[in-house]
UniProtKB/Swiss-Prot annotation:
Source organism of the structure: Caldanaerobacter subterraneus subsp. tengcongensis (strain DSM 15242 / JCM 11007 / NBRC 100824 / MB4)
NCBIfam families listed in its UniProt record: glycerol-3-phosphate 1-O-acyltransferase PlsY
Main location: membrane
Protein name: Glycerol-3-phosphate acyltransferase
Keywords, ordered alphabetically: Cell membrane, Lipid biosynthesis, Lipid metabolism, Membrane, Phospholipid biosynthesis, Phospholipid metabolism, Transferase, Transmembrane, Transmembrane helix
Molecular function GO terms recorded: acyl-phosphate glycerol-3-phosphate acyltransferase activity
Length: 198
């Protein structure tokens, strides 16, 4: 029963969509109707710029941190892992927004940095490096998620942590499936390209 409660609580924390809330109350727009249609920090950056995206990113990261800490407090590491997956699912598919959310990258950053700060930092650094070199946020996001999973193979923790890392990477990749198509076709937007608000 504790596992179910932790999962539900973490999911509901994830459902607090900061991109939607911030843009709705500061600009009176639904961010999902602009740019990529994604309710996340990257799309806020694309549509409204870095000043608007920064608080959204920070709050999304904090969602992951809070959920994992709550899960760990109640059940230990198994609870942290369950909460980590659940909070990302809540961000991606929020019940309050008809399951149209973000891609879970910023929240995943908070999750992995709380579960394993060292491996999380390495994965984050590699992901940021890819973004800096290619200017593709989507490619850097997927690279970071995959890197975290691979690091847990080469520097093994428990089977549970490895399974968690793989599932998290798959969630990130799944949410970027349209980006993958655009990357292949050469039509993916690069960081710095602004979308117009009609």
């Amino acid at each position: 029963m504790k596992f179910v409660l932790v999962a539900v609580l973490a999911y509901l924390i994830g459902c607090i969509n900061n991109a939607y809330i911030f843009t709705k109350y500061t600009r009176n727009i639904d961010i999902r109707n602009y740019g990529s249609g994604n309710a996340g920090a990257t799309n806020v950056l694309r549509v409204l710029g870095p000043k608007a995206a920064a608080p959204v990113f920070v709050l999304d990261v904090l969602k992951g941190v809070v959920a994992v800490l709550l899960g760990k407090y109640f059940i230990g590491m198994p609870g942290a892992l369950i909460a980590g997956i659940a909070v990302v699912c809540g961000h991606n598919w929020p019940i309050f927004l008809k399951f149209r959310g973000g891609k879970g990258v910023a929240t995943s950053v908070g999750v992995v940095m709380t579960i394993n700060p060292l491996l999380g930092l390495i994965a984050l650094a590699i992901g940021v490096a890819v973004i800096a070199i290619t200017r593709y946020v989507s490619l850097g996001s997927m690279t970071g998620a995959i890197t975290f999973a691979l690091l847990n193979i080469f520097f093994p923790n428990s089977v549970q942590v490895l399974t968690f890392a793989i599932v998290l990477a798959l969630l990130v990749i799944f949410q970027h499936r349209s980006n993958i198509k655009r990357l292949i076709n050469g039509t993916e937007s690069k960081i710095g390209q602004r979308a117009q608000i009609k």
